[in-house]
């Protein structure tokens, strides 16, 4: 039996070698490799700005109420895109209406958007929540507005100053049945009271009103500072000089200085200020695509190289007639500067809450 063992081992070895050769010589199955088709390039942003700038010879005429601004390429004048219009890096939204370009609908390029309204933060006053831009009256003496998380209030009682010098003993008292306090003048009976009376009989004679409002104390507040330090802005005041003797808000356009002129270049050598700047040529006023019917050569307040600021010192209000390319014309009241002076008493005219320091504190407004 010993001779059988070597033959058995040899047979097993031959079988193993045969299996290995069969595996090595058998054909290998082919593996299919999938190559995806090239995708369309959707992340490439189109070029809306071209350099050098190519602008038309004359700026476009914008519809009434649409601002004429410089495009996003800082090249040409365009009519600003309005709410709901498409916008790009060149065709920008109207900044004077608080609009911005929302690119969220153009992912992933973020090239073409839609003009949307800026949504601000609401306010909370005395436990009551108000939305951004909402106006409200916490009491009968104040009218407040919520502006992006901050509450600004203006007084409704138009008696900020005591009577004039003819009143020797003025007193600020509460009148039963009325919200606002009033000045009472305990004058000497021998001294007649000389009030500034507005007799509206002239209005009645012209047919403007049906009833007479005699013994109306005329009141006109000073004009507020211009809403912008350069360029076109708005100034307001309160006046009851009307047929009803009712306090109404009046507004006028104002332009303290041009934004596109470097006034510092006109300051004389050795000087630190230029109080008044006046352009050499007369030009037309423009407003929302409409042009004034005549040319003007206005004076502007200048600038200083130190910490002083220049504000109007002598001014008046003029009426300017505008003519629109399509539609009827209109007229607006405009600030006309005669003289300016420069001092260190400066404040930002855009700070609508600066006057609140002279008003009662928060507790009085909230209560």
UniProtKB/Swiss-Prot annotation:
Highest taxon of the lineage: Eukaryota
Compartments reported by the entry: Secreted
Residue stretches making up the TSP type-1 domain: 215-260
Signal peptide: 1-22
Record InterPro entries: CCN, Cys_knot_C, Glyco_hormone_CN, Growth_fac_rcpt_cys_sf, IGFBP-like, IGFBP_CNN, Insulin_GF-bd_Cys-rich_CS, TSP1_CCN
GO biological process: bone development; cell adhesion; glucose homeostasis; negative regulation of chondrocyte differentiation; negative regulation of fat cell differentiation; osteoblast differentiation; osteoclast differentiation; positive regulation of inflammatory response
Positions of the CTCK domain: 273-347
UniProt domain VWFC: residue ranges: 121-186
Disulfide cysteine pairs (residue numbers): 49-73, 53-75, 55-76, 62-79, 87-101, 93-115, 273-310, 290-324, 301-340, 304-342, 309-346
SMART domains per record: CT, IB, TSP1, VWC
Cellular component GO terms held in the UniProt record: cytoplasm; cytosol; extracellular space
Tissues and organs where the protein is expressed, per its UniProt entry: Highly expressed in kidney and lung. Lower levels in heart, brain, spleen, liver, skeletal muscle and testis. Expressed in low metastatic melanoma cells.
Pfam families given in the database record: Cys_knot, IGFBP, TSP1_CCN, VWC
General function of this protein: Downstream regulator in the Wnt/Frizzled-signaling pathway. Associated with cell survival. Adheres to skin and melanoma fibroblasts. In vitro binding to skin fibroblasts occurs through the proteoglycans, decorin and biglycan. Suppresses tumor growth in vivo.
Protein name: CCN family member 4
